[in-house]
Amino acid sequence: MKKLSTLMTMALVAMMALTLTSCDEDYDIAYTLEGTWRGNMYVSSVYDGYTYDATYTELCFVQDPYRYSSGTGYWIDHYAGDAPWRYVANHTEWKVRGGVIRIHLMEEDTYVEIANYRLDDNYFDGTIYYGDTKVKFRMNHTSSPNWNDYYYGYDYWTGYYAKPAPGVRAASGDTKPMRVFRTQE
């Protein structure tokens, strides 16, 4: 009986070790992902019959301290002078599950998945899946709360740290541009 109890205990310990390994990998991905990334996501916006290409995209990932493989952030596509706006921004909620990064663009109420990627402290490149569209991207890590002192709620401006000025929001009746991902030739 004691032998059976020992075998059952060892089997239970081995099974628990196997079930917890995938969470560790997702946590490591989320930890490395945390911060601000800048690069080309090959995004365009269609507005009033015209298509405008983003010059660069900025993504911010803030890790949830209670659910380590998920969090919030923002996605901003910056445009050149010929577009009727300087940027298109979305708040995001993101989650890493099974190595796939799933991002919910809250204002558009759409989802983007990132898979087949390489991620380290400096670079993030891979494939975006948006509906039936697959697009390659490459981004550089520009800031991280894990790198240096973090001045929460303050911006650096001409040598001094100061609270940011309040922004303005578009009127709710304004027509909004539609985000599209363009495939590379």
Regions found by a protein language model. Give the residues of each.
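Bacterial N-terminal signal peptides that target proteins for export
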Residues: 1-10
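Bacterial Sec-dependent N-terminal signal peptides
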Residues: 3-4, 17-41, 148, 159, ...
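Tryptophan-anchored aromatic micro-motifs
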Residues: 29-54, 91-93
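Beta-turn initiation residues at beta-strand->coil junctions
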Residues: 41-44, 74-79, 103-107, 127-132
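N-terminal glycine/threonine-rich, aromatic-flanked beta-hairpin/loop signature
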Residues: 49-100
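Acidic, glycine-rich flexible loop segments
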Residues: 98-123
